[in-house]
């Protein structure tokens, strides 16, 4: 199923691989898998995650291909302790920060939930029709998560 979803916006094999890895991480997080289990799956099927953020931070730069941003975004999640910490990790490495933050944030939200105040504020930036779409998707596909306090 993740291939069908990713092919809508990604038509290069590496792009599909990166989007699929992200979708699988979100799925596994929503299934209650641990970070270690999710990381092992990514390492086995998608990317070697044999680095830390501290190791790459001094030299990491903007890297457009998925293999230069998806593993880094996922590592930002794996090294986090909360939703907000995950986003801070993602931004801290530099590079394509909006992409890395979006990838990391998707997995972090599935794993931790988003704090209510962050979610509420973020929704104010969306047009109402997109808020309605989000609510319909969540009703069909997502268990409600309380989010962090």
Regions found by a protein language model. Name each.
Residues 10-15, 59-63, 96:
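Solvent-exposed loop and edge beta-strand segments that line ligand/cofactor-binding
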């Amino acid at each position: 199923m993740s291939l069908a979803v990713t092919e809508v916006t990604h038509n290069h094999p590496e792009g599909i691989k990166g989007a699929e890895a992200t979708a699988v991480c979100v799925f596994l997080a929503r299934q209650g898998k641990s970070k270690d289990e999710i990381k092992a799956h990514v390492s086995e099927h998608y990317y070697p995650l044999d680095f830390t953020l501290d190791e790459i931070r001094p030299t990491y730069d903007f890297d457009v291909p998925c293999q230069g941003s998806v593993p880094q975004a996922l590592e930002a999640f794996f090294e986090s302790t909360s939703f907000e910490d995950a986003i801070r990790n993602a931004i801290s490495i530099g590079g394509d920060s909006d992409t890395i933050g979006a990838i990391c944030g998707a997995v972090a939200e599935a794993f931790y939930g988003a704090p209510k105040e962050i979610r509420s504020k973020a929704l104010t930036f969306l047009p109402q029709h997109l808020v309605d779409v989000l609510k319909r998707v969540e009703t069909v596909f997502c268990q409600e998560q309380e989010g962090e306090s």
